[in-house]
Amino acid sequence: MSDDVLGLDQPIKLTKRTKISKIDLDGLMDKQKGLPFIISSYRKPLRVIERNDQRLAAKLEKKDLTSSQRRRLKYDNEFQNLQAILQFYQLWCHGLLPKAKFRDCIYLLRSFGARDTSLKRYRKTLIEAEINKKKEELGLAVPSEQPSTTQEYSKSEQRVNEPDDFFSEDEFYADPQDENLFVRPEVPHLEDIPNESYDAEMELLREMDS
């Protein structure tokens, strides 16, 4: 009979934890995979949404549709538009952090953005530049030179229609690769992450667009 009742002589099984790359400012500022990519490519999901809306308008022209059928078509269209936006950011997160789940990537981005002062200043610069642009369009401000931070990305935005190797628009219609896209119980709620907000600036942008 073995004297090792407690199993102290048994080999210990060690499980390897999946390593996730850390987010840093250099990675977020990378032109190919960082925030500049979103600035230069955000029109791609917008074109998908525009096509979806055009198809919806054509379907709604049919006079034999019931009210419930119309509501269903609108619901399906909103779902497809939301799916296109989510797919865009999922593909971007996969390029930024290939080993991270989508929800994990969002958590890391929110957490990093809440404490990094350089990223906060960068974000505020983009928001202020967009507000000034809206004011100029509405004639509320005299046109001025764009900050150097946005000039570089405005040039890259002009190349948005050029093909790139990062992803194609067809990928918006592919099934999400992340099986745990919405359910990650081990990850803290995003609302629990402290984050500096610019609610006043964003509210002003919404009022200008309305």
UniProtKB/Swiss-Prot annotation:
Pfam (any one): Swi3
Keyword annotations: Cell cycle, DNA damage, DNA repair, DNA replication inhibitor, Meiosis, Nucleus
Record keyword DNA repair present: yes
Region (Disordered): 142-162
Domain of life of the native organism: Eukaryota
Subcellular location: Nucleus
Cellular component GO terms held in the UniProt record: replication fork protection complex
InterPro entries named among the record's database cross-references: Csm3, TIPIN/Csm3/Swi3
Example GO BP: replication fork processing
Functional description taken from the UniProt entry: Forms a fork protection complex (FPC) with TOF1 and which is required for chromosome segregation during meiosis and DNA damage repair. FPC coordinates leading and lagging strand synthesis and moves with the replication fork. FPC stabilizes replication forks in a configuration that is recognized by replication checkpoint sensors.
Self-association and partners: Component of the fork protection complex (FPC) consisting of TOF1 and CSM3.
Protein name: Chromosome segregation in meiosis protein 3
Native species: Meyerozyma guilliermondii (strain ATCC 6260 / CBS 566 / DSM 6381 / JCM 1539 / NBRC 10279 / NRRL Y-324)
